[in-house]
């Protein structure tokens, strides 16, 4: 599962736009991952300019 390092996150939304399963949402300046929708493809970890997302 992908985890967010909120200390690194700039809340730019790059991960939201790339998620094919619509599992990532930007809600009031907080990135939220719906674990039920996430298929662990890790595209979000690739596009994050601040390396705030890590896949397990």
Curated annotation (Swiss-Prot):
Database matches in InterPro entries: 4Fe4S_Fe-S-bd (IPR017896), 4Fe4S_Fe_S_CS (IPR017900)
Cofactor-binding details, from the entry: Binds 2 [4Fe-4S] clusters.
Residues given in the record as [4Fe-4S] cluster 2 binding sites: 19, 38, 41, 44
GO MF annotations, alphabetized: 4 iron, 4 sulfur cluster binding; metal ion binding; oxidoreductase activity
Binding locations of [4Fe-4S] cluster 1: 9, 12, 15, 48
Cofactor(s) the protein needs: [4Fe-4S] cluster
Coiled-coil regions listed in the entry: none
Pfam family, one: Fer4
Domain 4Fe-4S ferredoxin-type: 2-28, 29-56
Keywords: 4Fe-4S, Electron transport, Iron, Iron-sulfur, Metal-binding, Repeat, Transport
UniProt-listed Gene3D superfamilies: 3.30.70.20
Signal peptide residues on this chain, from the entry's feature table: none
Top-rank taxon, per record: Archaea
Protein's job: Ferredoxins are iron-sulfur proteins that transfer electrons in a wide variety of metabolic reactions.
Name of the protein in its database record: Uncharacterized ferredoxin MJ0533
Phylogenetic classification of the source organism: Archaea, Methanobacteriati, Methanobacteriota, Methanomada group, Methanococci
């Amino acid at each position: 599962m992908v985890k967010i390092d909120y200390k690194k996150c700039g809340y730019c939304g790059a991960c939201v736009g790339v998620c094919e399963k619509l599992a990532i949402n930007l809600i009031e300046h907080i990135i939220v991952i719906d674990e039920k929708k996430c298929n662990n493809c890790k595209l979000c970890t690739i596009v994050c300019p601040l390396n705030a997302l890590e896949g397990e």
